[in-house]
Amino acid sequence: MTRGKPGRAGHDRRHASTGEHGLVIAAHGRHYLVERKGGGLLQCFPRGKRSECAVGDRVIFEATAVDQGVVVRVEERRNLLHRSDQFKSKQLAANIDQVLIMLGTEPGFSEDLLGRALVAAESLGITPLILLNKIDLTARLETARARLALYRALGYAVVELSVHAAPEAAHAVLAAHVAGRSSILIGQSGMGKSSLLNLLIPGVDAQTREISEKLDSGKHTTTFTRLYHLPSGWGHGGTLIDSPGFQEFGLHHLTEGMLERAFPEFRPRLTECRFYNCRHLQEPGCGILGAMAEGKIDPRRHALYAQLLHESEQQKPW
């Protein structure tokens, strides 16, 4: 019998047995910054053409120089948060416990983006936490609260704070939510994410510069996702992942079945549909449409579901 060449899985296992364990703490294109288990940072590249790592991944890597290496294998993930559109898919973070969705009273926040972020978290079984910042700017505070009433009624926690005007109070309330957890901070630009990072992570600007230099991303310090360890003095560990601000949150990768279960108010009604393959759009005997007619499901939420379902049906090259 002729022995064939070892497959990729065997190849990776063989290399993994001699590699080191590390944590991906930053990603920019195909460049990754990996933190060694015993300390120290290396710039690493994936083996092969595809970029398969995400910030928060635990990996096996081989050092190829004092400060460089190659990722041999990504260890099994608990979850992977990513966004996608019709043309590409972008990994945001892996192995996270919580999604912090940063909003502000001013400028006005996108309710569409909020809804999509909640759906993304729900689809993975990850806890979302809505942060309403800039509550000291009272001109639009009540409007913001009114817009968030729907989400409070659905059971989503909303934390109100003012990072700029009341930093000590903001620090206290946020520390209680992030200590001991791996959280990712997402949101539109202008909501106060940078101020929040400076509040929670001492020396964050210096860390960001170091990461940027090691990734060779130069001045593009806001275009990569990065992980920060929470202060050891908190006594509970934990990490905070910061992602670049964005204006869209595509979820083209979610299937019809994943979408309908990512709306918590839909779940109790799914068994009431007359047809097993009901799409909850215009089918007779639909439990979701019936609940909406009774005022138990908000039309805005159903409109978001319908839009996401339409997007999921678009042909994708990835």
Curated annotation (Swiss-Prot):
Function, as annotated: One of several proteins that assist in the late maturation steps of the functional core of the 30S ribosomal subunit. Helps release RbfA from mature subunits. May play a role in the assembly of ribosomal proteins into the subunit. Circularly permuted GTPase that catalyzes slow GTP hydrolysis, GTPase activity is stimulated by the 30S ribosomal subunit.
Gene of this entry: rsgA
Positions bound to GTP: 133-136, 187-195
Enzyme nomenclature, EC number: 3.6.1.-
Disulphide bridges, residue numbers: none
UniProt protein name: Small ribosomal subunit biogenesis GTPase RsgA
InterPro entries: G_CP_dom, NA-bd_OB-fold, P-loop_NTPase, Ribosome_biogen_GTPase_RsgA, RsgA_GTPase_dom, RsgA_N
Keyword field contains Mitochondrion: no
GO molecular function terms noted in the UniProt entry: GTP binding; GTPase activity; metal ion binding; rRNA binding
Quaternary structure and partners: Monomer. Associates with 30S ribosomal subunit, binds 16S rRNA.
